């Protein structure tokens, strides 16, 4: 399964997302957004592209905070995936989000605006970075691989 991952889009409308992101998301099986859409129009636009799983971020509108969960747990191709926005300083954020989930194979998060694609203690920590600068593609099958795509 091919998953498009983004976070921290920080735009007020869907049409402000980078064209390269939109082209890539047209070719995935699932879209995951790790929060800080800012505007509901971005959420609605992503839903038009395909199946979307999303969590809320600290900068999201009150409307989004009411309809999106703080965290999400999925199982895809036998792999458990935790999704959360994150909080606090970029330093140590992977440890903080790592403490939220147990028994997962992948943790997808955002907030720091710094991308990460690193395995620690058998868990892939995947942060696509701020969507104005980068996004990610996760491929899940017999193996799991992540790629950060710079804009």
What is each PLM-predicted segment?
Residues 22, 44, 71-73, 98-99, ...:
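Short secondary-structure boundary/capping segments
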Residues 6, 76-77, 99-103, 120-121, ...:
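Binuclear metal-dependent phosphoesterase catalytic core
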Residues 50-53, 68-72, 122-126:
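Active-site regions of enzymes building and remodeling cell-envelope glycoconjugates
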Residues 19-20, 47, 69, 90, ...:
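Generic secondary-structure boundary signal with a strong preference for alpha-helix termini
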Residues 5-7, 30-36, 53-58, 83-85, ...:
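Active-site neighborhood of phospho(di)ester-bond hydrolases with catalytic His/Asp-centered motifs
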Residues 74-107:
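Mid-chain, well-packed structural core segment of small domains
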Residues 11-14, 37-42, 59-65, 88-93, ...:
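Active-site environment of divalent metal-dependent phosphoester hydrolases
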Residues 1-50, 60-69, 78, 151:
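N-terminal active-site segment of His-dependent metallophosphoesterases
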């Amino acid at each position: 399964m091919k998953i498009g991952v983004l976070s921290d889009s920080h735009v007020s409308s869907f049409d402000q997302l980078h064209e390269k992101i939109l082209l890539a998301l047209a070719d995935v099986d699932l879209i995951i957004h790790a929060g800080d859409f800012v505007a509901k129009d971005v959420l609605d636009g992503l839903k038009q592209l395909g199946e979307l799983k999303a969590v809320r971020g600290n900068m999201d509108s009150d409307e989004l905070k009411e309809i999106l969960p703080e965290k999400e747990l999925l199982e895809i191709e036998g792999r458990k995936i935790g999704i959360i926005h994150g909080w606090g300083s970029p330093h140590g954020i992977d440890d903080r989000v790592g403490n939220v989930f147990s028994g997962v194979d992948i943790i997808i998060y955002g907030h720091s605006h710094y991308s990460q694609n690193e395995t620690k203690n058998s868990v892939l920590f995947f942060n696509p970075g701020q969507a104005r600068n980068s996004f990610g593609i996760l491929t899940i099958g017999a193996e799991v691989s992540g790629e950060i795509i710079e804009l």
